[in-house]
From Swiss-Prot:
The gene is eif3l. Component of the eukaryotic translation initiation factor 3 (eIF-3) complex, which is composed of 13 subunits: eif3a, eif3b, eif3c, eif3d, eif3e, eif3f, eif3g, eif3h, eif3i, eif3j, eif3k, eif3l and eif3m. This is Eukaryotic translation initiation factor 3 subunit L. Its main location: cytoplasm. Keywords: Cytoplasm, Initiation factor, Protein biosynthesis. Residues 330-536 form the PCI domain. GO terms for biological process: formation of cytoplasmic translation initiation complex; translational initiation. Component of the eukaryotic translation initiation factor 3 (eIF-3) complex, which is involved in protein synthesis of a specialized repertoire of mRNAs and, together with other initiation factors, stimulates binding of mRNA and methionyl-tRNAi to the 40S ribosome. The eIF-3 complex specifically targets and initiates translation of a subset of mRNAs involved in cell proliferation. Belongs to the eIF-3 subunit L family. Signal peptide: none annotated. GO terms for cellular component: eukaryotic 43S preinitiation complex; eukaryotic 48S preinitiation complex; eukaryotic translation initiation factor 3 complex. GO terms for molecular function: translation initiation factor activity. It is found in: Cytoplasm.
Amino acid sequence: MSYPAEEEDVNYDPYSYPNDYDYHTGDPKADLAYERQYEHQQTYHVIPEVIKNFLQYFHKTISDLIDQKVYELQANRVSSESIEQKIYEIQDVYENSWNKLTDRFFKTSPWPEAEAIASLVGNDAVFLILYKELYYRHIYAKVSGGPTLDQRFESYYNYCNLFNYILNADGPAPLELPNQWLWDIIDEFIYQFQSFSQYRCKTAKKSEEEIEFLRNNPKIWNVHSVLNVLHSLVDKSNINRQLEVYTSGGDPESVAGEYGRHSLYKMLGYFSLVGLLRLHSLLGDYYQAIKVLENIELNKKSMYSRVPECQITTYYYVGFAYLMMRRYQDAIRVFANILLYIQRTRNMFQRTTYKYEMINKQNEQMHGLLAIALTMYPMRIDESIHTQLREKYGDKMLRMQKGDLQVFEELFSFACPKFLSPVVPNYENVHPNYHKEPFQQQLKVFAEEVQQQAQLSTIRSFLKLYTTMPVAKLAGFLDMSEQEFRIQLLVFKHKMKNLVWTSGISALDGEFQSASEVDFYIDKDMIHIADTKVARRYGDFFIRQIHKFEELNRTLKKMPLNTGASISSSSTSRAT
C-alpha cells in the first residue's frame, strides 16, 4: 500500500523538479498554447511531467502517513507530533497545490482518470479512492456540462468504497486527513445526492437507454443509503456521547471508545451530524433536522467547530429550520450571530476563491432570510448587521411590511435550500416540472403563513398610536367588520408568541415569549394597549464606537510615516 521512499525523495519538491519545464520554449505564446492543450483535452494520452511528479508526491505524503498511523495503532497510541506534521503536509497539498495545478491545467476539463495514473502510485487502492473523490468532485464543480450518468454512478460507488474502508475495517482505519478535507467529503457526498435526486426527475432530454438505466438501478444514490452512511459514521464515532460529556464539562476522550478517540472518526461523526441537519432540511423535516444536533450547543464556541464552512452551513440550516417552524426570534438570533461572524472573518476566506464564493452566496441568502424573519417578527438586532440589511434589502423590506406577497416569494426562492424528493419518480409519467414539486410545496406552506400575517403589520402600526380605543372604532379605521377585526387581534396574539430558546443544550428547547413592541388586552368592547418597547441604550453604542476609534488610532500609530519626498511625489502624481 505504501509508496517506497527512495533516498533522493526525502526532500522532494514537486515544483522544483527540472522536468517541469521540459516542454516550455521560452516563447510566451507557445508556452500558453502548451498549457491550454491540457486545459481543454478530455483524454490524456500524455500526462504532463509536472502532474506525474505532483501525484507521486501527493501519494507519498498519504502513504507515509498511513505507515506512521499503522505504527501508532500497533503501539496503541492515538496520535503523535509526527502524525500532526504529516496531516499538515497533506493539507498544504490539498488546499494549495491541487488548486494551483487545477487552475493551470484542468480549469474546465477533468483530471486524468484513476486508471491512467494508477501505475504512478503503485496501484495504491486507498490513494486511488481518495484521488477519485477529488476527481469526481472537480467534474461536478468545473467541467463543462457536468458529470455524465456513468460518472454519477461511478462517484457513488467510489464513496461506497471509501466509507466501507472506514466503517468496515476490523479496527480503526490507519488513515487521518485534514479536517477541511473530511468536511468536504461529507459536504460533497450530500451535494452529489441532492444533484442526482434532481437529475433523475428531469427526463425530458434523456434517451430511452438512460431512463431504462435509471429505472433498473433505483438503489444508486438512494436516500436510505445516504442516511445509513451518515448514521453509521455518527454511531461508529460515538460522537453524541462525546458531545454530551464535553458540554457538561467532562473529558470526551473518556467515552470516545475504540474508534471515536481517533480524529478521523470523531470529525467525520461530527460533520455527519451537520450533514443530517442539512439532509432533513432538504427533505422538509425541520424538527428532525434540529433534533440531530441536540448535543451540540450552538451558542458556545466548540473545539469541534474548526472548519468555517461547517460552522456557516450549520447556522444557515438551523436558522432556516427555525424560520419554517415559526420560531422567528431564534431564527433572527442564529442568522444575526453567524452574519456577524462572517463580517468579522471575511478576510480569512479571500485567499481561496472556491471557499469565498460559497461563503459569499450563503451570506447573501442569510441576509435575505433575516429580512423575511424581521419583517414577520420585528425586533432589535446588532446595529452593523441592521445597517447591512437596510443597504441590501431596505426597499424590499418596506414592500414586505405592506404585505407584498411577491417580494416574500422572490426572497424565499433565492434564499431557501434546493429541496428534493426522496422518492424515485415514476418514469412512465414524469411531467416537466416534477423536479420543482418539493420546492413548490415548501413555498406554498411559507406563502400560507405569510398570508395569515398579512394584516399584522398594519394593525401593529395602529396599536402604537393609542393607549385605549373602542374595538368597533379601530375596526372601522382598518375597513374591517368588528368580528373580523377580533379574529385578526387573536391572530396577532398567537403569531407574536414564539417558542424561544433560553438555556440548555438542545436547540429544540425553549419557552413561549413575545418580543412585540406592543401588547394589549380587550375588556368588553375596549382595547387597552401598552407600549413594551425598551428604550434604546445609547451608552452601549457610543462605548463600541469609542473602542473602534481607539483600535484605529493604535493601528495608525504603528504605521510608518511617509517621508516628505514621498508625500511630495504622491501629490505631484495625483495632480497630473
